[in-house]
Amino acid sequence: MCIRDRPKAGKTTLLRDIATSVAVNHPQVRIIAVLIDERPEEVTEFTRHVPGEVLASSNDMDLETHTDLALFAYARARRLLEAGEDVLFLVDSLTRLGRAFNNDRRYATGGRTMSGGIDTMALDWPKRIFGTARNVEGPGSLTMLATCLVDTGGRGDQVIFEEFKGTGNMELVLDRSVAEQRLFPAIDLAGSGTRKEDLLLSEGTHQTITALRRRLI
């Protein structure tokens, strides 16, 4: 699932609340939370309140730390999945992850340069990390929840978002105007949705949700 967020719409708080709820209601799920290039105080707050493994790099760390941490978390999640565990993998954010790999010369290896100075090769690993979510035939599953920033004013950030847009099974859009009314989570109901949601719900439930959605929108 991709959580599309404008600045100050509450993405990190939403991820923290989701992780806490999963830990309470599904204690068997292994939670891995990855924060990339985040503010130090945000890292401290997340680490204090989120159960599970929190792997974080703050914005006062060097570039290689961001990319190395992301790859370590990716490998860790895959090992747990292969061991038959149910894993919740949280990434905040795909935007900063893309920036880090784009600025790390080990991964931006001379592919086609897109608008905003984004090297196409640099997004290879972020795409792999986001695409690791799956429900295997045997025991084990991996659910991915990742945030992606929009409307930051940076052309490169918009390019990164476009590369991930539509690639998840669900897109949850947060609305800053709703957050400013102190309504949380600040979800844009019209912009959010799940692919083939009718296959996940009973016919009656799906009809009820559809009717409610039409009334609210």
Model-derived segments and their meaning:
Residues 1-2:
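Short, small-residue-biased leader/transition segments that mark boundaries at the very start
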Residues 8-12, 16-217:
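P-loop NTPase catalytic core
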